[in-house]
Amino acid sequence: LNLLVNVLGKSPKELFSEFEEDYELEGASTGDVKYHLGFSSNIITPNGEVHVSLNNNPSHLEIVNPVIEGSVRARQERLKDKNKDLVIPILIHGDAAFSGKGVVMETLQMSQTRGYGVGGSIHVIENNQIGFTTSDPRDSRSTLYSTDVAKMIECPILHVNGDDPEMVVFAAKLACEYRYTFKKDIIIDM
């Protein structure tokens, strides 16, 4: 909800009206929770206007990742973006789902292939150590970090304290610079 209002600019009135009992979606409805609905807007930055999309995110954890990658690839091709600089996927994960859902590994494995590559994705992991089926973080995985599974594609992993906003911004800028330079995935574990 925070991302929808404070980053994408969705009005709080519009957001909260979706929670009213008599609110009806336009088009077909999946019956999923309202805050999983997508949204897109244009954001004004110091370097100009940027179009930002938050894809519909069904309750099936992480299943949206290959959909986003495909959407980005299609947009890159439509824009004739051979350098893959104009459309960039940013994927947000929970730590338990990142290391526990096979679709994450499948998406990572496709990341550098000619047919599916998008020039690298920026992965942001909210490492809150909350998995729906694990009450003790020691039971959530066999590795020290949830990001260890990404070592299979040898992408950099930046571990940053989410309580240090300046370091989070530094990590985000570094991730963007890496992605633009090397056209490969990078992970911010926060």
Where would I find each of the regions flagged by the language model?
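Conserved internal helical-beta-strand scaffold that buttresses enzyme catalytic cores
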Residues: 1-90, 96-137, 153, 157
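Active-site proximal loops enriched in glycine and acidic residues that flank catalytic Cys/His/Asp
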Residues: 93-94, 125-128, 161-164, 172, ...
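Amphipathic alpha-helical segments in well-structured domains
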Residues: 104-107, 143, 172
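Hydrophobic/aromatic ligand-binding patch that stacks against planar heteroaromatic rings
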Residues: 113, 149, 178
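A short beta-strand-to-alpha-helix junction
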Residues: 138-142
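Conserved thiamine diphosphate
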Residues: 144-171
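Structural signature of the thiamine diphosphate
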Residues: 167-190
